[in-house]
Amino acid sequence: MSTPRVMVGVSGGVDSSVAAWRLVQQGEAVAGLFMQNWADDGSGDCRAEDDRRDAVAVCGLLGIPFHFRDFSSEYWQGVFEHFLAEYAAGRTPNPDVLCNREVKFKHFLDAARELGAERIATGHYARVTQRGHQWLLLRGADRSKDQSYFLHQLGQEQLAATLFPIGDLEKTDLRRIARDVSLPTHAKKDSTGICFIGERDFREFLGRYLPAKPGQILDPADGSVIAEHPGVFYFTLGQREGLNIGGVRGRPAAPWYVVGKDVASNVLYVDQDRDSKWMLSERLRSETAHWIAGSPPARRFECTAQTRYRQPDEPCTVQVLDDGSVLVTFARPQRAVTPGQSLVLYDGDVCLGGAVIAATDAPLEQRLRTTPSPFEVIAA
């Protein structure tokens, strides 16, 4: 068996299958590696065994070696423990970003090198290119599937060793290729959500690790009690579903939206205005930012930003602060910018990097703050 030059992360899905097929067609010495990132909890919802069988079938059809690695312990320590801690603190984390940084482009890359591969490849909808001595992360050609948002924590070493073979494809073309070459996964449904939750109810899953803690749901305008909640950590800013608020006397029969939460007092705040003033913000402060190039383009610059996946680009001004965080000022007010989620910055199709959102200047968030405002500290 020859030593592979490229190790493809085969997930058992159609995207990684086509990625592997394209590399074989290009004459690369390829092998496939299936990662198990979540230990079987008996629910059967992750379909890991089915995915593994599909990955084996794809590798067999392509005539490439198949490898398996169990990274469930690394995933638990590097991703899931942080996931739980963030929810317990009332924030809304993004485990996919951490999974890419801590598992797929760390432990998978290490395993590939141990097996003799020089580079890794994945089925992400993104592109990587070299400009001079610098590696750039670009959005995928299919903007509706672009996954650069989840890859913004990668650095130069990782990009230099990574291929994204399907980054130039539209999803419809990828499906056609998979069907035309008879890949076993050509008709397989795309996976959605977080693997360790699968098709299960999110609240039920989270409740296994964070016990219910009922409290009041209040109107921030007058403090009136609207209903009760099972735990503030089950909800995120802007959420409509799952509140289970029935008819409220004196209120119109309209949907309610989460506009804030106070973990210390165990209170959830709601409003019937989808674009409620209580959760509109013009500025955010981040945690320490990560720059794909190794450093920011300038101490102060203009670019576009996304504060959630698939959000339209929002023009903004970025100020890099002395502690490594960034202050972002948007050209227009933003709805439901959520602490714990990822801020990702772009210059056209080039992903500059990003950071975890630490705070915003939304009126309700500022009112509930018990520590000095990070924006007042900057002004001082």
From Swiss-Prot:
The keyword Cytoplasm applies. The keyword Chloroplast does not apply. Residues 145-147, 308-309 are annotated as: Interaction with tRNA. It catalyses: S-sulfanyl-L-cysteinyl-[protein] + uridine(34) in tRNA + AH2 + ATP = 2-thiouridine(34) in tRNA + L-cysteinyl-[protein] + A + AMP + diphosphate + H(+). InterPro entries: MnmA-like, MnmA-like_C, MnmA-like_central, MnmA-like_central_sf, Rossmann-like_a/b/a_fold. Disulfide bonds join C99-C195. The record marks H124, Q341 as: Interaction with tRNA. GO terms for cellular component: cytoplasm. It comes from the Bacteria. It is found in: Cytoplasm. It is an enzyme of class 2 (transferase). GO terms for molecular function: ATP binding; tRNA binding; tRNA-uridine 2-sulfurtransferase activity. The active site is at C99 (nucleophile), C195 (cysteine persulfide intermediate). ATP binds at G9, V10, S11, G12, G13, V14, D15, S16, M35, G123. Residues 94-96 are annotated as: Interaction with target base in tRNA. Catalyzes the 2-thiolation of uridine at the wobble position (U34) of tRNA, leading to the formation of s(2)U34. This is tRNA-specific 2-thiouridylase MnmA. The gene is mnmA.
